[in-house]
């Protein structure tokens, strides 16, 4: 295999999906520890501690102590090059989180075993479903009193509609947690407390029967029964089913104590796919093609007054990036030279000399790049599957100075192109309605309008709870629909027709009465 093909085969690009506080920051940090990216754990402290996590970029993040941005961390592990895309887990996450999942080849789902499957996890899994993304699952916090592990598997299968194949099985929980049993290698790994900040060689015992003394007779007998039950009731791991997104291998452990993370990482790097082919409007692009192609899935604005630059996060789909090369910007039809692309290591920006399929690089953007833009070495290609997602929270924009209306409109359209918010102009009023997935997006927009466009605004409530993009092939039916429902209709910042529903019932009725109209929760960029 050539050096070029080896480089592609090494790449594993994934994101972690979880509900806030399920342990995502902790597990990220342990991965960096195993990848020698940090020397001791505890440097990516939870945000409450005052030591900021390595992925905090914006000032607002530091003030609020949450990770708004989707940063990228690259590190080596087991002969692989891991690209981990960090997704905000906080309540105030945004569409960026959803869109990041369009740039990965697989995902790690972290479940808080005390609480089970939670709301945010369900939403993120629905996004993974759009592309049948392969999922690995880590059941976290077994050093606490958790839910019954069989119950947890049932919940994942029933709520998330994915088959579970446990790879190992917990021995006890909480203060009686003794370790995990590997169902495929007949091996017990014994748990000890106090080793969370280091890579510790936990003791392993080959053969379940040989671990009887170490785990105690009561737990041993319970475990034997549970294993029989698990083997009978759960699914065998099947690599093809996993790659098709139908089945998830499940690992148990506690990220805080750095226990079970290595086993999960070993399994992940073994089974997770290398960079996959990507669909473009014109054709399918294979990862091992020689020419560079890729797309922008996120734009990171720097809130630092001194540096107004923005970074466009670019997923390489094929070919090799080399410093100083020229690329073709499909939307504008212009050539662009990349003199200083960035690579990301846990929040430190470094200039990158080369990149391969699966890698994420940062392009300096002075306003010409938008989310969803495709780049090639000359071919007209537009990658599919980088959607806008319907907002879930809406507010009306109130301008402090009415003379600044033009600047406000310009600012909002530009910020919507960047993915910071979505803007809607209703048919029957001069209002501007903003839509977002997370509350914090409204603060970000107000702050950026003030600093970049010199426009001060505030927000007030608006009678909208849901938005759906409207599509219809029959022009007459579409025109009839527009007349009948003009009170609910608006155009978004890019000029797409949108239905703004005051209630879920209102939307349901409109859908039932208009079977030929498509009400879509996503639209392509």
UniProtKB/Swiss-Prot annotation:
One biological process term in Gene Ontology: regulation of translational termination
UniProt keyword list: Cytoplasm, GTP-binding, Nucleotide-binding, Protein biosynthesis
Pfam families linked: EF-G_D2 (PF22042), GTP_EFTU (PF00009), RF3_C (PF16658)
GO molecular function list: GTP binding; GTPase activity; guanosine tetraphosphate binding; translation release factor activity, codon nonspecific; translation release factor activity, codon specific
SUPFAM superfamilies: EF-G C-terminal domain-like, P-loop containing nucleoside triphosphate hydrolases, Translation proteins
Keyword Protein biosynthesis in annotation: yes
InterPro entries the record matches: EF-G-like_DII, EFG_III/V, G_TR_CS, P-loop_NTPase, PrfC, RF3_C, RF3_dom_3_sf, RF3_GTP-bd
Protein biosynthesis listed as a keyword: yes
Function: Increases the formation of ribosomal termination complexes and stimulates activities of RF-1 and RF-2. It binds guanine nucleotides and has strong preference for UGA stop codons. It may interact directly with the ribosome. The stimulation of RF-1 and RF-2 is significantly reduced by GTP and GDP, but not by GMP.
NCBIfam families: prfC, PRK00741.1, small_GTP
Family assignment from sequence similarity: Belongs to the TRAFAC class translation factor GTPase superfamily. Classic translation factor GTPase family. PrfC subfamily.
Stated name of the protein: Peptide chain release factor 3
Organism: Francisella tularensis subsp. tularensis (strain SCHU S4 / Schu 4)
Gene expressing this chain: prfC
């Amino acid at each position: 295999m050539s050096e070029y093909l080896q480089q592609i085969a090494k790449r594993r690009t994934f994101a972690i999906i979880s509900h806030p506080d399920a342990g995502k920051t902790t597990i990220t940090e342990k991965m960096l520890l195993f990848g020698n990216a940090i020397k001791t754990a505890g440097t990516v402290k939870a945000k409450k501690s005052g030591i900021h996590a390595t992925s905090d970029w914006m000032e607002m993040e530091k003030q609020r102590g949450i990770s708004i941005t989707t940063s990228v961390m690259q590190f080596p592990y087991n002969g692989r090059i891991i690209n981990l895309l960090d997704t905000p887990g906080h309540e105030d996450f945004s569409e960026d989180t959803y869109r990041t999942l369009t740039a990965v080849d697989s995902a790690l789902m972290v479940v808080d075993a005390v609480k089970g499957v939670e709301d945010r996890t369900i939403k993120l899994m629905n996004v993974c479903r759009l592309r049948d993304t392969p999922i690995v699952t880590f059941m976290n916090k077994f050093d606490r009193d958790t839910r019954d592990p069989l119950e947890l598997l049932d919940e994942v299968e029933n709520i998330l509609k994915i088959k579970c194949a446990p790879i190992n099985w917990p021995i006890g929980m909480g203060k009686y947690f003794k370790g995990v049993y590997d169902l495929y290698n007949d091996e017990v790994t014994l748990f000890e407390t106090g080793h969370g900040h280091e890579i510790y060689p936990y003791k392993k015992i080959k053969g379940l029967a040989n671990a009887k003394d170490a785990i105690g007779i009561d737990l041993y007998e319970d475990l034997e029964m549970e294993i029989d039950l698990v083997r009978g009731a759960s699914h065998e791991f099947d690599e093809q089913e996993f790659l098709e997104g139908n089945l998830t291998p499940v690992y148990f452990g506690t990220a805080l104590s750095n226990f079970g993370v290595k086993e999960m990482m070993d399994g992940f790097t073994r089974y997770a796919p290398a960079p996959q082919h990507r669909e473009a409007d014109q054709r399918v692009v294979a990862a091992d093609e020689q020419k560079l192609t890729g797309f922008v899935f996120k734009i990171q604005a720097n809130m630092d007054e001194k540096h107004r630059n923005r970074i466009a996060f670019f997923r390489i789909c094929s070919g090799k990036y080399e410093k100083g090369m020229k690329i073709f910007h499909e939307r504008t039809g212009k050539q662009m030279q990349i003199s200083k692309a960035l690579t990301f290591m846990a929040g430190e920006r470094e200039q990158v000399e080369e990149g391969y399929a699966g890698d994420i690089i940062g392009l300096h953007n002075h306003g010409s790049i938008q989310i969803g833009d495709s780049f090639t070495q000359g071919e007209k290609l537009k990658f599919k599957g980088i959607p806008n997602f319907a907002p879930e929270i809406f507010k009306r924009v109130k301008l402090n100075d009415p003379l600044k209306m033009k600047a406000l409109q310009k600012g909002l359209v530009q910020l919507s192109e960047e993915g910071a918010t979505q803007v809607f102009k209703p048919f029957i009023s001069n209002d501007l309605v903003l839509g977002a997935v997370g509350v914090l997006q409204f603060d970000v927009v107000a702050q950026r309008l003030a600093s970049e466009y010199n426009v001060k605004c505030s927000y007030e409530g608006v009678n909208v709870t849901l938005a759906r993009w409207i599509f219809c092939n029959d022009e007459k039916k579409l025109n009839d629909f527009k007349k009948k429902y003009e009170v609910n209709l608006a155009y978004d910042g890019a000029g797409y027709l949108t239905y703004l529903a005051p209630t879920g019932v209102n939307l349901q009725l409109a859908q039932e009465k208009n079977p030929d109209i498509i009400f879509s929760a996503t639209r392509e960029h």
